[in-house]
Amino acid sequence: KKKEFTKSFAFRMKADSETKLTKNTGFYERTSKLTRNFVDARGYWLPNDYTKHGVINEYTACREKAVVIDLSSLRKFEILGPDAEELMNYTLTRNVKKLSVGQVVYSSMCYENGSMFDDGTLLKMSDHGFRWVCGDEYAGEWLKEQAKKKNYKVLIKNSTDQINNISLQGPNSRKILEKFIFTPPTQPSISELEWFRFTICRVKELSGIPLMISRTGYTGELGYEIWCHPSDAPKVWDEVMEAGKDEGLIPAGFGALDLLRIEAGLILFGNEFDGQVDPFEAGVGFTVPLKTKTDNFIGKENLIKRKENPQKKLVGLELISK
């Protein structure tokens, strides 16, 4: 009789937090049939590469055709309430007040001393609703602390376990989505979706699986992220793979993603920044609009000083021969 044994790591998001065990994402039912090489990504098992392809082939497919990557370990927080915009404008370096509903912005998140401890994307879901997508669960607790200090009227909810997401990246990604995505007249179609915008849509028809698709990514290629409920994840994976079978689509893991994001100059916590450097030193000074954001935000005073006296500089090296 065949027996199956699972493997988990116990970890804490903070020193005083309860331990949590590594979990599977909604896409595991499909990805586990294609690879046994999984890595622990902040509490979730995600593929490092796939048996039939390997890191180099997956990297090449993203640059030339298309890949799909499970990124469900990203933390998602819903920020709701009359003071939601005030909170996010105060806690992020970006000017959140410039966002319109349906827009996405990449931002740094800093301590009072100007050091950057997380980054992510902020989606404006409604007039009083935002979704913060980032790398670390601590960001949610930190947002709650800041809201309490300022007496903001907001609800902050961790929605990570209710929202899974895959990243569809590569030159053929738009063509793949257009084959099976239905968008209502009130939402932008896939062909109309602009960079750093999102659309609310469904699979194939009005009664199909509900999705959100954002034109975002972590590879430097044309790309999108597909957001769904974990219970719908296997069917969504099937639809993506079926639509991409004639477009050179293959699954890719974290190994290829690391190569892609380094080439694109995209930073990762624990590598290019670590809670000690500021956004200017980490190469994302564009996320700190000191001249145009007149409102106060956490770290502003020290970021003004640190911009004038950087201690480090992140640079990219292009290798022209072996």
Kindly label every feature range from the protein language model.
Residues D70, D119, E225:
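Acidic active-site catalytic centers that drive phospho-/nucleotidyl reactions
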Residues K1-Y50, L123-K322:
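Conserved, structured C-terminal
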Residues V55-E64, M109-D119, K148-Y152, E205-I213:
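Short amphipathic beta-strand starts and helix->beta connectors
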Residues Y90, R94-E145, K149:
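Well-ordered mid-protein domain cores that form the structural environment of catalytic cofactors
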